[in-house]
Swiss-Prot record:
Source taxonomy: Viruses, Duplodnaviria, Heunggongvirae, Peploviricota, Herviviricetes
Protein name according to UniProt: Uncharacterized protein ORF66
Superkingdom as given in the UniProt entry: Viruses
Region annotated Disordered, chain positions: 32-108
Amino acid sequence: MDSITLNAFDVSSAYTGEFVYDLDLNLFNKMLGGDPAPKPTTQPEERPTGRPIPVPRRRVRPRPAEDQLEEPLEELVKDPIGGPRGEQVEEPVEEPVEPEHPRRIPIPRNRSTRHRFLSADSSPPSHDGAVFDFRDRPTVFQKRGRPVRDMGPVRVSYDISTDVDRLMHNLQSMVKESRAVKVSEKDVDSCHEACERKYVGALMTVSSALRTLMVMVPDIKRIDHPQIKLLVNASRNDFVNVCLTESQKQRSLGVTNVYIDGTDQPLTVNLGLDRNDRLKSTLYKMAQLWKYETKMWERFSAAAKGGYDMKDLIEARRLRVERPFEQTSQLVDYLLDSIDDLTITGVERAKLSDWFTLISRYLKLDHQLLVNELTEGYILKEENKVLKERLDSLQVQVRKLQNRDLLDKWK
């Protein structure tokens, strides 16, 4: 069937063949209730605000001078089109087309992980979302730890400084002395707040930390040192006895009432020094730290997957530990130095190295912290001994004065 030209909006037509529509804009606008179609114009339309709409300009080639034209300018003007040289020609603007590379990945926006995708000699881009081409810069991944070496049977020996040895010897002697002294339950209750947080909390957490380290790294069991074995094998009762012994020393060397024969009022002697709560608060915070960290260590040693960050844990608990215990600090430093000799994989070595480095950061304690406490107790003991000797001499003089029968003669 031949196609015919019909009006697109002539509803009276009953033709059912193939239509070739000839759109009548005036009739279309009348159906919509609008005005006739406006004529096309090149003038800028008026906006409601009164400002004309800017029309994009075309790049026009500048007209050459008359002396450079092969034909006179009048002939070019007579031609309505302008001729091949007089017409306005639009120069196409070429847009840069990026070559498609199959191996293109975006650099991540996170600055902490961006360096993994860049080479060592390159700097990260100044803007986010940059595209990195592997063919230009080869990827260099971080290498952590050393490759596993077959060292054979390795004997680990631990060397502790003289000061720590002396400290542990003093603690051990205090434990032996406290076993011979029968302490009542009343004394346990009285020194709970004052001493148990100071010594029991610190030593117990250090002991549990050493046990957990032995679970993580079996080579630590080869450490042959009596003081380390004392810490690992000591029970809570031993630490409580140390606590009670120190409490009794502080009580006996503190404010003392001295009774002199022949007097009614006792003589009050202050043999104690001003105590600072810094030691108690520091060790108590350290005990809190190790309480949570040993749990993380046990999870890590059981699953060996990581996912636990000590720094985040400390900040979440609002713990600011500056100087915890020196004994564990030296042990961690030793393990950090000897971690390459352990028979473990590179991933485990890198993880342990990171943990030990971060742990040692919080274990920088002056090794004289607890030694000074013991030394202070020794000094007070000597002062108490001198004062008792002086008291004995005063009592001898009092007895001599009381036994006199004759009065002194004035000369």
